[in-house]
Amino acid sequence: MLIPREFFLQLGGFDERLETGEDYEFCQRACAAGADIVNNPQLRVVHHDFPRTLRQFIRREAWHGRGDLRSLRTFLQSKVALGASAFLVAHALILTGLFLPGMLSLLPLGLLLLILLLAASTWKKYRYAPWHSRFVNGGLFYAYYLGRSASLLYLLQRRSGRTPRLA
């Protein structure tokens, strides 16, 4: 992120109270103050501690997802948090359809919701990519939403008084 120091200080810098998403929140304030956010693909970004395994990726997304759960407002404004909620609902429908007698009709509904969520996410992000790449990224979106929905479960556990643990 490149920004004049004076403007950064005028906006109050990053909100240090935020566990995650402080850069996104800062950009929202900058836009509200009249800044234009421009993505320059020629600039290279290095992320330290980039996940090297699927488990690390899911854990990182679970941590990132906690930023969307600061308040009901941030939750409702986050397409990702809403997508993670749909992910959980789809799995609840699938499991209910599989394991509760007389509820088999919920199985196709849950599968449809899950497929639509993954397809819409993949289409939005990779609509210009080759078809085989879209299928692979659909699988990665499954892991992405698995991590993001884990942060929702983390919040529910914390609110219920249980000690949450992200594996």
Where are these regions (language model features)?
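Membrane-embedded multi-pass helical conduit in multi-pass membrane proteins
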Residues: A86-R159
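Conserved nucleotide-sugar donor-binding
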Residues: M1-G12
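Catalytic donor/gating beta->alpha subdomain of glycosyltransferases that bind UDP-sugars
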Residues: D15-L76
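Short, flexible helix/strand-to-coil boundary loops that buttress conserved ligand/catalytic motifs
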Residues: G12, D49, Q157
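Basic/Trp-rich segment in TM-proximal cytosolic loops or flexible interdomain/linker regions
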Residues: D49, L54-L104, Y128-R134, P164-A167
